[in-house]
Amino acid sequence: MGQVIDESPTAEPRFKARGVDKHFGPVQALTQVDLDLYPGQITALCGDNGAGKSVLTKCIAGIYEIDHGQFFWEGQPVHVRTPRDAARLGIETVYQDLALADNLDIVQNMFLGRERLRNGFLYEDDMERAASKTLADLRVTTVRSIRQTVASLSGGQRQSVAVAKAVMWNSKLVMLDEPTAALGVVQTKMVLDLVRRLRDRGLAVMMISHNLNDVFEVADRIAVVHLGRMVAQGRASSFDRQSVVDYMTTGASSRSGQQANADGATSGTR
C-alpha cells in the first residue's frame, strides 16, 4: 500500500480497495493499490498527471474492471464491473466535464436517463419537487429557476447541479474529479462549501484535486498515488504541502513521517 502515516479511524470504511491491479496491454496503470474511504469524511486523492488517479476512479465507478485485487463495500466483498453495479451500491461520480447537457434545464439534467413516468408520461411535477428538495437540502440557492437551461449557469452553479444530480439517488459515496478546476475565487468557495455539506450528510467523499489549497481546506484524509501505486494515505493533519508534493513527484517523503511522529501516529509499510 505504501506508507501509512497515521492510525486509521475506528469506523469501518464504507469502501475499501485491496491489492488492486489494472493494466492496459503492456501498460501497468495500477499496482497493488489499497484505498480506504470513510463515511462522513472527505478523502483527497492526489497525484501528478498520469499517476493513476483517473484510472482508479473509473475502476471504482465501474468504467474499467480491475484485473486483480478486491473491493469491499461496508465490509463485504463486492464486484464492480459496470457503472450500474456502482450505482446499485450507491457510488456516484461527478467527472470534470460534468456530463451536463447545455440545452436542457436543471430538472431535465438531474433526471437525464432516470426520468420518472406516470401513466406513460413524464411526471414533471414530481421531478421538479425532487430536484428542488435536493438543491435546497444542499443549500444551493444561487440558481434563478430549476427550469433555466444549464447553458445559462455559471461554472460554480453547473458544478452544484452536477453534484446535486449525483447525490439524488441515495448515494453513499460521491467521487468528484477536479471540482474547482477553472473556477474563480467566489465559485470555488461555493463548491468547497458544497463538498463539506456532502460530508456533513454522512457521505463518503473522494475528491481528486491538484489544488493543494483546496485539499487542505476541506480534506479529512489524503491519499497520494505515484506511478500507479498508493504511496501514502492518512489524516490530512499528518501531511504538509511539501510532503504531498514530495509524494506526488518522487513517491517518498521524510516530512510527513516526522509530522506523523509528532502527532503520535504510526508509520510503516504494509
Per-region residue spans from a language model:
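Glycine-rich phosphate-binding loops of nucleotide-dependent enzymes
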Residues: G2-R270
